[in-house]
Amino acid sequence: MLAAMAFVIARPAFALEPAQIGNFEVTEVAPGNYVHYGSFQERSPENLGDNANIGFIVGERCVLVVDAGGSLPVGLALKKAVRRVTPVPICHVVLTHVHPDHFFGAAAFLDEKPQFIAHRNYPRQLAARARPYLNYLRRDLGDFAEGSDIVQPTLLVDGRLELDLGGRSVLVQGWPPAHTDDDLTVFDRATRTFWLADLLFVDHTPVIDATITGFLAVIEDLRRIEADHYVAGHGRSRTPWPQVLDPQRRYFTVILDETRAAIRNRKTIQQATEEVGLSEGKNWAAFDAFHRRNVTTAYTELEWE
């Protein structure tokens, strides 16, 4: 089921020219599927919010972009990468979920007039988060945040959406609450390339912004999908599919089991954040930045079981 809507926060007429990103590389991971691998570093004026894996799929008729990056400069760099590969128009921009490292570059594509596609829950979450997200972006990037406007989706997905790029069929699929409550994946049927966005983290600490039990359930559903290639939301690996999901599943299982034990033993949420899952620290980048938040999310969910 689809719903249509449109809204853009306009860029001021006096806006400065956006900063440029140098050495913006894309890798063809399968025929017609191009990925730019973002940094694990925190957002800063040096990386301009280039912190997530983003990319595009090229059809004979048009291009589908998978996430737009964390700022206008990142989005513009991605659009230039598209143009280095093909002159065909960009017809779809899929915003896989409502996290700023994936959507703040969307304004770069407005002149192409694509459909901006998101999960049906995306607008509700964005309405609640837009102002703080913009404030944090300006805090982190300063003047380099100029023009990184919020672009609302024009097409909402409830379930599954099949798209024809011309000689290439692509499936956009919504998922139950997991990483967020508005997760989408993209599957290129021609090459069986699975773009998972933040339903898959490789080496970077996975993040729970919805439900740990839901995330574990979705991982089991993801494992059943037959794919020859995959793209994570963060990180990269040569581990075959679906075994690449195993470290993430292990991490969540450790948090789940140890948080339940902490609750049974009447530990406070503060105690849980200081004790649960610390054995996993050696396995993940950005562990200190995200792990305690994951335990907090898990505790608030599991204490009501």
Regions found by a protein language model. Name each.
Residues 1-15:
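N-terminal export signals
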Residues 16-21, 28, 124-175, 180, ...:
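Metallo-beta-lactamase
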Residues 28-81, 184-196:
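Conserved beta-strand hairpin/beta-sheet module of binuclear metal-dependent hydrolase folds
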Residues 32, 57, 67, 82, ...:
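Divalent metal-coordination and catalytic microenvironments
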Residues 60-64, 72-117, 225:
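Active-site metal-binding motif and surrounding structural segment of the metallo-beta-lactamase
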Residues 216-267, 271, 275:
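Divalent-metal (often Zn2+) His-rich catalytic cores of metallo-beta-lactamase-fold enzymes
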Residues 264-305:
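C-terminal regulatory/interaction regions
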